[in-house]
Amino acid sequence: MAKAAGSAAAGEKKGKTNKKFKKKERKHVPHGLAHIQASFNNTIVTISDPSGNVVSWKSSGSLGFRGSRKGTPFAAQQAAMTAANMARDHGMRSLDVRVAGPGSGRESAVRALAAAGLDVRVIRDVTPIPHNGCRPPKRRRV
């Protein structure tokens, strides 16, 4: 008796269930922050709303640039343009830009954000500078 009831319950579980996926909701963010992290090897552009929630991001590596090409100004420009277009789809019109790092893609990424139709209001350099903190790595001898 108990076995028959158990097999009937198991038969009900095997039936197909329809999974309904909710479409990702587009946020309407008129103003945001662009964080540009430019290292010697790569450039990462992240666009967020004022509270820090990420709206869009792109990096030179995610666009298919590999090796030493990731650190070029052109790769940074492409990453910034793509991230800006994604942010404009969310209704973003103006940006405050925060640039960090010593990379060669700093300037071109900021120019690309402005060229993509976003109003750049403030450009702030937030590169971390140590007050004689950690000992730097030894010099390269090539």
Curated annotation (Swiss-Prot):
UniProt xrefs under SUPFAM superfamilies: Translational machinery components (SSF53137)
Single Gene Ontology MF annotation: structural constituent of ribosome
Quaternary data: Part of the 30S ribosomal subunit. Interacts with proteins S7 and S18. Binds to IF-3.
One BP term from GO: translation
Keyword annotations from UniProtKB, A to Z: Ribonucleoprotein, Ribosomal protein, RNA-binding, rRNA-binding
Domain of life: Bacteria
Protein name: Small ribosomal subunit protein uS11
Pfam families in the record: Ribosomal_S11
The family this protein is said to belong to: Belongs to the universal ribosomal protein uS11 family.
Organism this protein belongs to: Koribacter versatilis (strain Ellin345)
A GO-annotated cellular component: ribonucleoprotein complex
Stated role: Located on the platform of the 30S subunit, it bridges several disparate RNA helices of the 16S rRNA. Forms part of the Shine-Dalgarno cleft in the 70S ribosome.
Region (Disordered): 1-29
InterPro entries xrefs: Ribosomal_uS11, Ribosomal_uS11_bac-type, Ribosomal_uS11_CS, Ribosomal_uS11_sf
Compositional bias per record (Low complexity), positions renumbered to this chain: 1-10
HAMAP family per record: Ribosomal_uS11 (MF_01310)
